[in-house]
Amino acid sequence: MKLGTVSNLITVPEGTDPVLGRIERAADLGLSVLGITLRDTWQDHDYLIRVSGLAQSRRIELRIGAGGNFYLHGSDGEAEVARVAEMLLAIARHTNIRFASTPAGPMLTTHRWTPGPPLVERMSTVARNLRSLADAVAGAGITIGLENHCDYRGHEIATIIEEADRPNLRVQLDTGNAFSVFEDPTDCARALAPYTVSCHLKDIHVTPFAPTPCRGSRAVAVPLGEGHVDNAAICQILQDQAPDPANLALLCEPFYLPDDADPDQFLATSIAWSRTHLAPFLT
């Protein structure tokens, strides 16, 4: 497994290009993979070539988040698939990036408890649209990773993958997001490991019921090793069951970045924990 991070945990000096600067910093930290976004720059082909060239020279594998709303129906769904496919194909033509993660759709407005069509119907819509997206980008060697994005439980994501039935539609497992849908993270990992090709490593401190001033169940973002996600056990599950554990990316990511958090320290703590406790899995 290859250790990396998402881009928002890396800070760069003011005036530095945010993507190029983060590639340099990731390499300086000894990481192997960096998750970035190119949604605002994918039409600038010269820029894509610069990004790809720097990443190759610094030996950083780049993975992107595609985004998209795959709950749409009819012509709206077809247009959304075409929009995302156009972006991914353009990026692939000018870079070595061949993996893009995506949620099913906007998690704040659509999830397993959202009123509306039955859950099974919603999941089938996502499967149909992602099947079309996978077909549209397969010729370029692109793999799509559907993430459990604070919306579905592991077995539900697995059902979507199985229904879509495309070899280049796999999973980006987020280890901490399981808590957001009241699921044990290791149960989620067991359900998704056979499809997982990328992973957001996340830790969350859980309080089953907090007192005043904020009553109720709490899930708080913390650096790796300071919460209740058993990421070492999850990595063992992935080692045993993932299709290609040696090439599986482990990207450190916060559940959210607390207002008073120092991103650099958050990442440093997470990297140090990973290199100690996940050493048997890292390549």
Indicate where each model-derived feature is located.
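Histidine-acidic metal/acid-base catalytic patches
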Residues: M1-T11, T16-A27, G154-N168, F179-T283
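N-terminal pre-domain/capping segments
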Residues: M1-T95, A268-T283
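A short alpha-helix capping/helix-coil boundary motif
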Residues: K2-G4, L29-S32, A66-N69, T110-T114, ...
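Hydrophobic faces of well-ordered beta-strands that scaffold small-molecule active sites
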Residues: K2-N8, L34-I36, L62-A66, A100-T102, ...
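Active-site beta-loop-alpha junctions enriched in small/polar residues
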Residues: V6-I10, T37-T41, G67-Y71, G105-M107, ...
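Residue-level preference for long, well-ordered alpha-helices that form the structural scaffold
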Residues: G15, D44, G77-V81, P115-R122, ...
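Short glycine-rich, flexible loops that bind phosphorylated cofactors or substrates
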Residues: Q43, T109, P208
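Active-site acidic/histidine proton-transfer and metal-coordination neighborhood
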Residues: Q56-E61, G74-R170
